[in-house]
Structures are given as structure tokens and as C-alpha cells.
Amino acid sequence: NTTIDQSQKNLLNLLNEVDFRVASGLQSYSSAICEVLDRYAENGMNVNYPTGSRRSLEAAVRCCIVTSMNQTAAQVTNKYIIEAGAEYVLVSAHMGARHDKNNPTGLQSHDWWQGKVYKIRGSDPDAPNLLEATGYDINPQTGEGHVVNPLGLHGYNCRHSHKPWDKSLSNPYVDANGNPKIDVHESQQLYDLQQQQRAM
């Protein structure tokens, strides 16, 4: 148990080191992931999470770096949102977004809340509250973003982004009738295939 604890501490130290280099532009995502994997691959390690889930080292490193960089980008976006005095944000949409068959309209089902306009404070009939819908909050005074629920927007391994939005613009993720342009069934099939591939 002590060796595992030390290995995980060593991994966290290395992740912090490469996170700094990637965030400062000194190293690319790809090279950071390769460096971490090269230094630990020979041990065949897995990372155990407090939730009970377990990931291969490659999956854990990728998740950590992608999550960290997306959260950093979100903080920069939030500054622009505050400078512009925007009340609304548009959340991006992509094929293969995470979904939960047991709770298809829940926070952890990213395909449910992606591609929609949200209000930062309060809500409108056509713009739900950002925090309530996605688990992500933006302080309207400071622009600081906070992942309230790590299963939602900018949480674990989330690839979605958000940007300031003017409701007079047309949402590029929906058709003229307001329906998502991404086929939900195809997107869920792609997600399931990606999960099967990661499990191999």
C-alpha cells in the first residue's frame, strides 16, 4: 500500500509539473502525455480514485491534462464575459458527448445540456440557469468560474466550452425549428463505442 501511495504522489507531482509547462506553452498536450506515460509505463500502473473507479495510467493522465487545460481556457473566457457585460453564454456541442442511460436528462448527461444558451444569473423561459443545468458557475463580479459539480461542464474529462452570447444571434447548434443539429442517437452510439474502446 505504501508503494502505491508513493507512486500516486509521484504521479501527482509529475502531473503538476507538466500542467505548468503545458499551461505556459512550453509543452504540447501530446508531448506532456507521452512524457508522463514514458516515465510510468513500464510499471503498468493504474490510478485508483476515491469514488472506487479505476483507470489506466494513460486514461488518468489524459483526463487530468484535458480537464486542467479546459478549465484554464474557461477562466480566460470568463474574463471576456465579464468585460463584455454578457448575461448569457452558449455551451458548445460535439458528437459523442457523455450520456447516462440511467439519467438521460441529468447533469452527468452532457448530451442533454450541450449546444444551448444559458443565463449566468437567474433564468429566462428560453435560457435556463447555467449552474442549475450544467453544474458550472461564473461569478458575475470577478469572472471566476467554479466547477460546482465535477460531473458537469468543465468537470472530469469534459471537452465542452462556453462563450459569451447575445440572444439575438442564431444558435449554430440548432436548426430553424430549435432542434439539435447533432443526431442524439448517433452521438450516443459514438459515445458507447468510445467507452468500449477505452475499456480495452
Model region roles, listed by residue range:
Residues 1-153, 165-200:
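Domain-core detector
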Residues 160:
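Catalytic core of tubulin tyrosine ligase-like
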Residues 157:
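Extracellular structured ligand-interaction cores
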